[in-house]
Amino acid sequence: MDDSGELGGLETMETLTELGDELTLGDIDEMLQFVSNQVGEFPDLFSEQLCSSFPGSGGSGSSSGSSGSSSSSSNGRGSSSGAVDPSVQRSFTQVTLPSFSPSAASPQAPTLQVKVSPTSVPTTPRATPILQPRPQPQPQPQTQLQQQTVMITPTFSTTPQTRIIQQPLIYQNAATSFQVLQPQVQSLVTSSQVQPVTIQQQVQTVQAQRVLTQTANGTLQTLAPATVQTVAAPQVQQVPVLVQPQIIKTDSLVLTTLKTDGSPVMAAVQNPALTALTTPIQTAALQVPTLVGSSGTILTTMPVMMGQEKVPIKQVPGGVKQLEPPKEGERRTTHNIIEKRYRSSINDKIIELKDLVMGTDAKMHKSGVLRKAIDYIKYLQQVNHKLRQENMVLKLANQKNKLLKGIDLGSLVDNEVDLKIEDFNQNVLLMSPPASDSGSQAGFSPYSIDSEPGSPLLDDAKVKDEPDSPPVALGMVDRSRILLCVLTFLCLSFNPLTSLLQWGGAHDSDQHPHSGSGRSVLSFESGSGGWFDWMMPTLLLWLVNGVIVLSVFVKLLVHGEPVIRPHSRSSVTFWRHRKQADLDLARGDFAAAAGNLQTCLAVLGRALPTSRLDLACSLSWNVIRYSLQKLRLVRWLLKKVFQCRRATPATEAGFEDEAKTSARDAALAYHRLHQLHITGKLPAGSACSDVHMALCAVNLAECAEEKIPPSTLVEIHLTAAMGLKTRCGGKLGFLASYFLSRAQSLCGPEHSAVPDSLRWLCHPLGQKFFMERSWSVKSAAKESLYCAQRNPADPIAQVHQAFCKNLLERAIESLVKPQAKKKAGDQEEESCEFSSALEYLKLLHSFVDSVGVMSPPLSRSSVLKSALGPDIICRWWTSAITVAISWLQGDDAAVRSHFTKVERIPKALEVTESPLVKAIFHACRAMHASLPGKADGQQSSFCHCERASGHLWSSLNVSGATSDPALNHVVQLLTCDLLLSLRTALWQKQASASQAVGETYHASGAELAGFQRDLGSLRRLAHSFRPAYRKVFLHEATVRLMAGASPTRTHQLLEHSLRRRTTQSTKHGEVDAWPGQRERATAILLACRHLPLSFLSSPGQRAVLLAEAARTLEKVGDRRSCNDCQQMIVKLGGGTAIAAS
């Protein structure tokens, strides 16, 4: 029997699992509806006999008779043929049920007292049954119905506790019919003397039973079947019991299925508070296993024991306590499940939205994600609207002449889009979800973005509701202007008013003919009016002509100019494209910047000419306009007209102010386009187009007057002069000089209004450099070692860079190849080498420091401005050349002060890794180390000379096109001359201490090797740069003196440096190879110090030569060599006296 019970339990578990997979919401609703309709089909279960023992309960009572028990058990068994044992009935009648409270809504369930005879309960206490593992069931046929005895053996604790178990029963037979039993309530009251009671009940196996649990909203969940375990309890007294169903009035119908194989309970709970009854009984000895369903519902079952025989139930005495209200558990309803699905779906979409908007690595809460998504959508809508506007403007601008005749492009664009904007705003407000948080604004513009201020074009509150342009401010096309000028000229030339007046006088004379016949005496008949009759028609004619001409001027220069209101939609469109042009210039996208600037001009009503006829008309009109603006009478008349217009302003700001503002904006746009054309950033156009843009910028800038700063006005005139100089060449060179002088006159008498970045043009050297056309503006300028990179789209900045390099080259050339100047007596005298070089370097330093001080005419972010701050690269070269000149002059203090600047090499030069920069740097360090006052100065200086010599040789071997070849040559020659002079000075310091006059100190092998290497670099440089020849003979004689070679050849080389030449006997190009004054003085000093006395023609010749060398060195400024020469003169004075005696 135990095996069969276990087999039935296993089958029930399998069927329950299958039921959980197959049940749906409709099936369970039909089941509950079917159960609720069983009251009419089974009236015996709800008879008054069952409810008689519950006084006052109304509809909820219980029965104590055996008939109710028999009927319920028969209904429960269905088709079972088993009969109820009479002993069971007799023992059941001894149970008395107390009356229940009439309140069905009470939180405490009604109590039931079960009395057990004390004689039937053994006194020996029993331990809690041990749950044994379940054995493997044997397969048995399911067609045979078996009877099993189920024993429920609870163990009670010493503390009295009350537990109420409400378990309505559902029995399902093979024919799938349901029978409903009323809920039964069993109250077990225990005490310390109560012993374990074994309740054994015989039930019949029912096929295909399922255990279901109904939640508050009707969702059914499948529960796993309870495990049936067989517990052996041989000492427990068994009493046959027939369970009597009871009826209580509660909020819900609790259904319980009992089965002989120990299948679990199916409870349909409507009130969630009753789910606490499914928790395990909290006793000390009762162990109740817990089962967890698939939906997380916790169920409890009691351990059962399979008995052999039926035993009666003993009455258990004890008191009844009120039950505690069940604790409210976690709500597990279908509504929560559906909400959980919705939340999961919403969370997935929010995560996907976050990945699209902010990326996968961003961390932000849901409201922040939604807010950012809304902002991004608004941004996309705004960008879409902007692109739509720009597309429409460009389409209208491409139409050549049809839309340019008296039509404002900005007004057309805005009027066509107004209706679309209103519809789109309504759609956006309808589609927009509510605010993501309480802090969001209730009303917002559909185009506003939280991260940036809204554009006036997209915010109706910021754009004034006023007409874009009245008909008088639309402007005229240049062809119409030229046509009006031609008609006016023809009217004044042919003067039809004169003919009309003459025709009127003739008509009056015809009306009064001479009547009568006869002869008349010839005589002079004087008119009655006199001279007034002759003057009146002339005055009237000139007055009418003057009115006509003035009207034409007012129409062309005042009413013909397009004017844009400051807060109109056209103005906003213009500024949007202007700012976009600035951004394009900052990125280096010059084509896009030019497109935006052309769109700006089209919005202002000043589109660029697209055909040759339009270009000719525009150029002619600008020439006429510039000529008219120079007439004071015309300017005075225009001012009076503006004052009259100011009395009745069309807008609040006044027509004159708006006209000047529009002229300023157009002038700056023309100026930027002109700069891009000059620098070659745009496709090359015709020279007339460049002249047209230059004249437009100049005319409109002069019309703007105080609206445009003086520095910008000067820059516009200089750019116009530069454009005429580069594109027109010598044909219109006089116009370039005119605009340059005009720019200088705008700076004021003391150049107070000129910006620092343009101050170099006010210097005579700057003017000469600008007008001699020794510069060129390139589209892609190469990087230079001598100046920092200037703005590639600013032609003035490029010319300034070329001027700075020209000054640096002049400063170095004055050291390595000084130029001769002619005096009044046709005698040539070389200028002072060091003074000229220092003057150039001083000018260069002042012009370099003034770079970029001017304020840009456009926004501060524009790239069309000079680099802010001084040119640190050019400043470093200035300091390096100053150190070289100071060392050659013997000014040790100046060398130390400027060497601190040379030590800080700019990063731009360090990145280039140029060997020439390293050579000049180590040469400066060698000169600084050779100064007196240092312990190891000579050795350190020699080491730096070696490094500089190696870098110089590397720079001569570098092949490739350089940006400044002439400047590279002079710097290489200067570096080589400095190294050779420094080596010579170190050798002479070693020899001057102990050697007498006329004797030579021989240098070491390392010194000679280094000198030979530098001399080889000088010879190599002389092949490509002829001025290096003037240094070759002197240094060759020096190395022979250091090595102690034959003095004959040394004397010849020195004689070559001392020889004077005239310009008549030389050819072109040989003048650069002549030695300078400093070379001649150095040669005299070497000959008098190191050559033997026999090589001089007379004993006094050495003193004469030294005196001449001293004068030359003093004139040049070489104080160190001059001091040495004077010391030798003093020594030679005593020696000469001795030799003469």
From Swiss-Prot:
Domain of life from the UniProt record: Eukaryota
Q: How activity is regulated?
A: Activation by cleavage is down-regulated upon activation of SIRT3-dependent PRKAA1/AMPK-alpha signaling cascade which leads to inhibition of ATP-consuming lipogenesis to restore cellular energy balance.
Bias class Low complexity marks the residues at 63-82, 98-110
Q: Could you tell me at which residue positions the Glycyl lysine isopeptide (Lys-Gly) (interchain with G-Cter in SUMO2) crosslink is annotated in this chain?
A: K464
In the record, the effect of L484A is given as: No effect on cleavage by S2P
Tissues in which the UniProt entry reports expression: Ubiquitously expressed in adult and fetal tissues.
**Full protein name:** Sterol regulatory element-binding protein 2
